[in-house]
Amino acid sequence: MASKVLNKVMGIIGLNDEDFDEYEDEVMEEKAIARENSYDYDEKLNDKNSSNSNNKVVNIHTASSVKVVIVKPKDYDEATQICDDLKNRKIVVVNVTDLEPKTAQRLLDFMGGASYVLNGELLEIDKGVYLLSPSNVDISRDLKNDLASKSIFNWSK
């Protein structure tokens, strides 16, 4: 009889065992749904990671897009265009033989600063002729030494 009274009091207060069971069922269902959603997310994430790690495709068009620009500037104002070409990852050959020595030096200083900032390289090919190469291009100096030693081209006047 005491249990009947206790059940009635709990029913009035709202603490029936049936309510607890329903509440526990709801909590368990929510946890199961949450686990399913997180499992799907983790599974998709793992699938993406495994496909990226197995992907060894190299874009072959990157090497063919290298362009060479040959410039013979008439004044210092063309320095920005030369450096823009370098910034756009183009190889630039600059001939400053027709410029005044002071203007050529200013232009060379500007190009040297730009190539340094862009991790490029500035090489003197001949007196007054310079090669600016972007960071994605490697320049070999062996050819110049070989040609000079064989006297085919006298690069070192």
Curated annotation (Swiss-Prot):
InterPro entries given in the database record: Cell_div_SepF, Cell_div_SepF/SepF-rel, SepF-like_sf
Main location: cytoplasm
Example GO BP: division septum assembly
Keyword Cell division recorded: yes
Subcellular location(s) of the protein: Cytoplasm
Keywords for this protein: Cell cycle, Cell division, Cytoplasm, Septation
Pfam family, one: SepF
Recorded GO CC terms: cytoplasm
Cell cycle recorded as keyword: yes
PANTHER family linked to this entry: CELL DIVISION PROTEIN SEPF (PTHR35798:SF1)
Similarity comment: Belongs to the SepF family.
Chain's role: Cell division protein that is part of the divisome complex and is recruited early to the Z-ring. Probably stimulates Z-ring formation, perhaps through the cross-linking of FtsZ protofilaments. Its function overlaps with FtsA.
Subunit structure as annotated in this protein's UniProt entry: Homodimer. Interacts with FtsZ.
The protein's name: Cell division protein SepF
Species this chain originates from: Clostridium acetobutylicum (strain ATCC 824 / DSM 792 / JCM 1419 / IAM 19013 / LMG 5710 / NBRC 13948 / NRRL B-527 / VKM B-1787 / 2291 / W)
Source lineage: Bacteria, Bacillati, Bacillota, Clostridia, Eubacteriales
This protein's encoding gene: sepF
